[in-house]
Amino acid sequence: MAKLIAFDQDAREGILRGVDALANTVKVTLGPRGRNVVLDKAFGGPLVTNDGVTIARDIDVEDPFENLGAQLVKSVAVKTNDIAGDGTTTATLLAQALIAEGLRNVAAGANPIELNKGIEAATQKTLDELRARATPISAPQEVASVATVSSRDEVVGKIVAEAMEKVGKDGVVTVEESQSLETTLDITEGISFDKGYLSPYFINDTDTQTAVLENPAILLVRNKISSLPDFLPLLEKIVESNRPVLIIAEDIEGEPLQTLVVNSIRKTIKAVAVKSPYFGDRRKAFMDDLAVVTNATVVDPEVGINLSEAGVEVLGTARRVTVSKDETILVDGAGDAEAVEARRQQIRREIETTDSTWDREKAEERLAKLSGGVAVIRVGAATETEVNERKLRVEDAINAARAAAQEGIIAGGGSALVQIAETLKAYAEEFEGDQKVGIRALAAALSKPAYWIAANAGLDGAVIVARIADLPNNEGFNAATLEYGNLVDQGVIDPVKVTHSAVVNASSVARMVLTTEASIVDKPAEETADHGHGHHH
């Protein structure tokens, strides 16, 4: 495939045009008076949204050189969304401003390497300032404020806060479509996994087609149970104690399974057998989690516990277990609260130390399962278009609330960034030459979110930014009420984690663009057919 190559100024200008194409589309959505963007979808109706990352993902630019720029900024939005789940519009805007400001200086003869050193120093200073300004939050109304700002909907804010309060900041909050017009919240306490009963003969509640066990003995086995002589001694002890039993093992086959089924039909025993979920190390880790939650010991020959010799002391219990054909839910396990908390801390350490995204995601899932219940927010609306739009906002709100609970909040509306920009201008005086220029470039970029929030409200952004710069910490401009004041008290707040990742990702992409000397793209095929040569402007 033939390539087209553009060098220095041409390459950078092409990239900047692509950056602008994407960022200008996204920035109209910023702030309480921001607008929506309509996306044409190949399937179903058009999607109306103000979610930055959803819009960014949809944009590809025709000119291949410009498209490089668009894709680079798209990566800022996507990465910010992956880390913090919100703040994608702010990140896109910061990247655009920083790239434009930086390229202007490069065109005027600044050294890109020195500029980058300045931007890097300024980024670090900004992060330090953000941390210094952070206010920790815990009260439900503070969480509700964060969620309300993110979703622009008070009802959603309250529901998200309630969900977080019930399941904790590490708990699972899922979003589903509601069958009604109302948006509602359901909480299920306990730990669940996606495996159901091995035989429908275990069902004892025919209305719901589930097996329900009250205060059962819970037997956890690391390997397969395939030998009846090994299994029978422990099973007989359980039958003698007159308790129902839940058995979770890698698999239960042959005679042991037949024995359980036959005795369940005869009602001599109330039992359910379930395969353990996942594979390999994940399965092992999850079984160990279950053991802690239910106060059981996993039967595992590797650690010297054989099924044939195991006594009732290996059994755990829970208040209630419900098993459907594809899910098992254990409610109120008998595990010691301190042991469960120690297990959570161990998983948190794994999350912090692992380099693999996949491992981290799986560990986060385990942490969420261990952190108590599962909250389900069912989103209702009159039309499918509206439901989809609202679901995106609810997901943003959950992410924002979680981020705020983790790292605290700052004044929203871009105000904190404007004030940090003032600090950067003073900080720049400690540097020389192009490094100083780099620090000033980030300072200029940091005022852009506040500028566009004001501009989207139909006001003069420059005037408002100048006024915010003189205000003390936590004060700024509220674009919803069009008044200045203490934004934290008014509930106009941003999670530090969201702003933090927006700044880091924008700075990272801008530094890459500033040091770009050439861009290479595939030569468009139809051009060769028509003219025998590619052209580029």
Curated annotation (Swiss-Prot):
UniProt EC number: 5.6.1.7
Q: Which UniProt keywords are given for this protein, alphabetically ordered?
A: ATP-binding, Chaperone, Cytoplasm, Isomerase, Nucleotide-binding
Residues where ATP binds: 29-32, 86-90, 413, 478-480, 494
Please name the top-level EC class of this enzyme. Answer: isomerase
Q: Which GO terms describe its cellular component?
A: cytoplasm
Catalytic reactions on record? ATP + H2O + a folded polypeptide = ADP + phosphate + an unfolded polypeptide
Per the record, the domain of life is: Bacteria
Spell out the Pfam families in the cross-references: Cpn60_TCP1 (PF00118)
Q: Which NCBIfam families match?
A: GroEL, PRK00013.1, PRK12849.1, PRK12850.1, PRK12851.1
Concerning PANTHER family, the annotation shows: 60 KDA HEAT SHOCK PROTEIN, MITOCHONDRIAL
Entry's family note = Belongs to the chaperonin (HSP60) family.
Q: What does this protein do?
A: Together with its co-chaperonin GroES, plays an essential role in assisting protein folding. The GroEL-GroES system forms a nano-cage that allows encapsulation of the non-native substrate proteins and provides a physical environment optimized to promote and accelerate protein folding.
What this protein is called in its record is Chaperonin GroEL 1
Designated gene of the protein: groEL1
